[in-house]
Amino acid sequence: MSDNSQKKVIVGMSGGVDSSVSAYLLQQQGYQVAGLFMKNWEEDDDEEYCSAATDLADAQAVCDKLGMELHTVNFAAEYWDNVFELFLAEYKAGRTPNPDILCNKEIKFKAFLEFAAEDLGADYIATGHYVRRQDVDGKSRLLRGLDGNKDQSYFLYTLSHEQIAQSLFPVGELEKPEVRRIAEQLDLVTAKKKDSTGICFIGERKFRDFLGRYLPAQPGPIMTVDGQLVGKHQGLMYHTLGQRKGLGIGGTKEGGDDPWYVVDKDLDSNTLLVAQGHEHPRLMSVGLVAQQLHWVDRQPVTAPFRCVVKTRYRQQDIPCTVTPLDDERVDVRFDDPVAAVTPGQSAVFYQGEICLGGGIIEQRYPLTIPA
C-alpha cells in the first residue's frame, strides 16, 4: 500500500473537467478520495438554476463513474457576506475588483478547507487549479502551473503557506490537452465540457444585466482626453481601463480609424475618458502602489527587491522593483511603461516559478505626458 492510503482528500468538484481529472489522479496516487460540490449562489432565475443543476449532475456522474462519494454544502451566505458585498462596494467606488481572487480567499481555501477538515475529516483538500506546490524547509510554496497558458497562480496569491500545505493541485503538473485526454479515456461526462469563464460561482450570464440588478446605473458623458464629447455611457461601473469593446463610438478625423480605449474614469463628474490607440500615453503607467498585501510565506517585506509582476491574468511578466512603503503598502516601478494598470485589480509578484504574493492596486503612476 502507498503512504497515501490512510490520507483522506476532499476534492472541490465544480462539474468541470479539471476537478474531475484531479479526483481520478488522486485515486491513482492511493488517497482516499471524496468530492464536495459547493453551492455558493442562490439562483434567482431559471437559466441560472439550470446551469447550477447541470454542474451538480455532472459532478455526481463523475463521482459515480470513479466510485466515490459526493458531498454537497451551501456556502451562499458566506459568499454573499465575504465576496459579493465587497465586490459591489468596489464597483460602486469606481474600481474593478477581481471576484475570483476573493472567492478563492474566502470560500475555496477558507470555508471549504474548514468544512472539509472539521466536518468531513479531511487531511487535504484538492482543487482543479493549474498551480503547483513545492515544500522547502517545512514551508509550502506556490508555483506557477506547468501549462503556461493555463497557470492560475494569479488567482491564488492570497493563500498562506499553511493553506497551501493542506491543499493538493493534481492537474498543476499537466498541460490542459493532457487533462482532456485523460477525461476522454475515462469516458467522463465532463471530457468535452468547455471551461467556465463567468464570475467565479455566479456563472455565465450577461454581466451588465447582472450588475444592474444590484447597483443603480448612472449614465453620463464619454469625453476624449482633449475635452470633446463623443458619446454617452450607461454607467462607469460597466467600464474598465483599457476597454475597447462596447463603447459605441467611431474614429475621428484627427485620430483616423484607430479604436477608442477607456483611459480613465472621473467619478466626480461621472465622465468616461477615452483616447485612440492602445498605447496612448494616458493609458500607460510607470508604476503602481499596492495595498492589502498577502505574502505566501507571511513574512513582511523590509527592503526593496527585484522581481516580475502581473497586473492582470495571463499578462506577460513585467520586470520591476518593489519597495516597501509600510507594512500594508508597496511601491512598484516597472522597467518599461505598462498599459491599462487598473485600480482594484491585483498586482501579483513572482521570482522565477515561485508566486511570492501580491496586493490590490490602490493607484497607478501615469506616464507623464510631455507638455
UniProtKB/Swiss-Prot annotation:
InterPro entries: MnmA-like, MnmA-like_C, MnmA-like_central, MnmA-like_central_sf, Rossmann-like_a/b/a_fold. It catalyses: S-sulfanyl-L-cysteinyl-[protein] + uridine(34) in tRNA + AH2 + ATP = 2-thiouridine(34) in tRNA + L-cysteinyl-[protein] + A + AMP + diphosphate + H(+). It is found in: Cytoplasm. Residues 98-100 are annotated as: Interaction with target base in tRNA. The active site is at C103, C200. GO terms for molecular function: ATP binding; tRNA binding; tRNA-uridine 2-sulfurtransferase activity. The record marks H129, Q345 as: Interaction with tRNA. Its EC number is 2.8.1.13. One of its GO terms (biological process) is tRNA wobble position uridine thiolation. Keywords: ATP-binding, Cytoplasm, Disulfide bond, Nucleotide-binding, RNA-binding, Transferase, tRNA processing, tRNA-binding. Residues 150-152, 312-313 are annotated as: Interaction with tRNA. Pfam families: tRNA_Me_trans (PF03054), tRNA_Me_trans_C (PF20258), tRNA_Me_trans_M (PF20259). CDD domains: MnmA_TRMU-like. GO terms for cellular component: cytoplasm. PANTHER family: MITOCHONDRIAL TRNA-SPECIFIC 2-THIOURIDYLASE 1, TRNA 5-METHYLAMINOMETHYL-2-THIOURIDYLATE -METHYLTRANSFERASE. Belongs to the MnmA/TRMU family. Catalyzes the 2-thiolation of uridine at the wobble position (U34) of tRNA(Lys), tRNA(Glu) and tRNA(Gln), leading to the formation of s(2)U34, the first step of tRNA-mnm(5)s(2)U34 synthesis. Sulfur is provided by IscS, via a sulfur-relay system. Binds ATP and its substrate tRNAs. Interacts with TusE. HAMAP family: tRNA_thiouridyl_MnmA (MF_00144). This is tRNA-specific 2-thiouridylase MnmA. It comes from Yersinia pseudotuberculosis serotype O:1b (strain IP 31758). The gene is mnmA.
